Swiss-Prot record:
HAMAP family: ATP_synth_B_arch. It comes from Deinococcus geothermalis (strain DSM 11300 / CIP 105573 / AG-3a). It holds the Pfam family ATP-synt_ab. GO terms for molecular function: ATP binding; proton-transporting ATP synthase activity, rotational mechanism. InterPro entries: ATP-synt_VA_C, ATPase_a/bsu_AS, ATPase_F1/V1/A1_a/bsu_N, ATPase_F1/V1/A1_a/bsu_nucl-bd, P-loop_NTPase, V-ATPase_su_B/beta. This is V-type ATP synthase beta chain. Keywords: ATP synthesis, Hydrogen ion transport, Ion transport, Transport. The keyword Transport applies. One of its GO terms (biological process) is proton motive force-driven plasma membrane ATP synthesis. Produces ATP from ADP in the presence of a proton gradient across the membrane. The V-type beta chain is a regulatory subunit. PANTHER family: V-TYPE PROTON ATPASE SUBUNIT B. Gene3D superfamilies: 3.40.50.12240. The keyword Cytoplasm does not apply.
Length: 470
């Protein structure tokens, strides 16, 4: 049946869970947004996720209970999923589909953009080489985040990655560009407790004033979880490349996103790949992660921190494995450090930032930054090896230098890694690093230059650097 304004499709042949199968609808485009109406006049939203000569498959955004094959009808709303964007989105909270959930009126859109974005010309990409300060010593010194980079956080079930995400969102800045820095925060599959945590944390700390929040709940439809990061990235690209903002996009938890991808793939009866995930998951993740970057001739930038919880702490699981192939390093949240009460429990040894060298050093952070990072890494690794030795032989078998390395490892965890909720500048972080390194003999600081040792060696540890949680 055709009305004056829209065409309706009435031949709904099959309903399976959240999926609707509509016959003779081959002119519907993949990704189109539709409206489903039942016999009582109630409407639901949906998206076309598959089109063939015989039928179109529609993922319903709400429950399908109450839909009847005889009375259900489908009509086209938009040819592709779009989001109305505006600078007024800063300071607002939205659900996973971009609808306001803060009690304020809808945003008056300046543009309506395709949430799949526009491909970024590789030749137009600029080299990422400007340091982003997160205020977290282990990240800023050892695995530095660079503007335009995509640097994931690998966590595990029960670890405080939500608290870490909130701390980064609160503290992150590009030194010298504080006025045009914004955070776009997208959370997928949240429990009610987590929704309350993020809402209260952003409001309590004032971070909401420069942030845009997209919060998808665990009881929302799976397809909404697939749209949420695209809504966030579309907003980020608009703020960055239309208004010149340096935007940090935090996506959590990408494991929930991938499980929604698997759920929908199963409902469509697709042939599964590794551990039941669809074979195209790599391509799908790349379509999100590759939207980070700096474009030549445009002042803004998009930087990404995807956060994922590794099932069974398995870094070879398909989700962290494929994420690692696409992104430029990883920050690893450690269960052992968390068990000691250390926050944030980031282990620098398996962590890596492949673009760190581009954005640190003289004229960017400090001339000794890279060498201090290398020396901390080497000394901490030595201290951990000695801990294993002590567990077997006891401390009597150690030399005096070995005992200093053991104490270094303890101080490194207590003062440098375990900063609690402190917001440290990179200068503060390097000062703490030198204070801990000064416990070692100068002869052991083989990765530091003589000039740097003469200038900074001898700094004293201050108890105020032992982090506490607010």
């Amino acid at each position: 049946m055709t009305t004056l304004l829209k065409k309706e499709y009435n031949d709904v042949s099959y309903i399976s869970g959240p999926l609707l199968f509509v016959n003779a609808a081959s002119d519907l485009a993949y990704g189109a947004i539709v409206e489903i109406k039942d016999g009582t006049g109630r409407t639901r939203g949906g998206q076309v996720i598959s089109v063939s000569d015989e039928n179109a498959v529609i993922q319903v955004f709400e429950e399908t209970r109450g839909l009847d094959l005889a009375t259900a009808s489908v009509s086209l709303v938009e040819d592709v999923a779009r989001l109305g964007v505006s600078r007024e989105m800063i300071g607002r909270r939205f659900d996973g589909l971009g609808r306001p959930i803060d009690g304020l009126p809808p945003v008056v859109a300046e543009k309506r953009l395709n949430i799949n974005g526009e491909p970024m010309n590789p030749a137009a990409r600029a080299k990422p080489e400007e340091f982003i300060q997160t205020g977290i010593s282990t990240i800023d010194v050892n695995t530095s985040l660079i503007r335009g980079q995509k640097l994931p956080i690998f966590s595990g079930s029960g670890l405080p990655h939500n608290e870490l995400a909130a701390q980064i969102a609160r503290q992150a800045k590009v030194p010298g560009h504080e006025g045009d820095f914004a955070v776009v925060f997208a959370a997928m599959g949240l429990t009610q407790r987590e929704v309350s945590f993020f809402t209260q944390e952003f409001e309590r700390t004032g971070a909401l004033a420069r942030s845009v929040l997209f919060l998808n709940r665990a009881d929302d439809p799976a397809v909404e979880r697939l749209l949420t990061p695209r809504m966030a990235l579309t907003t980020a690209e608009y703020l960055a490349f239309e208004h010149g903002y340096h935007v940090l996009v935090i996506l959590t938890d990408m494991t929930n996103y991938c499980e929604a991808l698997r759920e929908i793939g199963g409902a469509r009866e697709e042939i599964p790949g590794r551990r039941g995930f669809p074979g195209y998951m790599y391509t799908d993740l790349a379509s999100l992660y590759e939207r980070a970057g700096v474009v030549q001739g445009k002042p803004g930038s998009v930087t990404q921190i995807p956060i994922l919880s590794m099932p069974d702490d398995d870094i070879t699981h398909p989700i962290p494995d494929l994420t690692g192939y696409i992104t430029e390093g990883q920050i690893v949240v450690d269960r052992g450090l968390n068990a000691k009460g250390i926050f944030p429990p980031i282990n620098p040894l398996p962590s890596l930032s492949r673009l760190q060298g581009n954005g640190i050093g003289k004229g960017k952070t400090r001339a000794d930054h890279k060498n201090v990072s290398d020396q901390l890494f080497a000394a901490y690794a030595n201290g951990l090896d000695l801990r294993k030795l002590v567990a077997i032989t006891g401390e009597d078998a150690l030399t005096e230098t070995d005992k200093l390395y053991l104490r270094f490892a303890d101080d490194f965890e207590a003062y440098f890694i375990g900063q609690g909720d402190q917001d440290r500048s990179v200068e503060d972080s390097l000062t703490v690093a030198w204070a801990i390194l000064s416990k070692l003999p100068q002869s052991q600081l083989t990765r530091l230059s003589k000039d740097a040792i003469d200038k900074y060696y001898g700094a004293k540890l201050d108890e105020m650097w032992r982090g506490n949680r607010i």
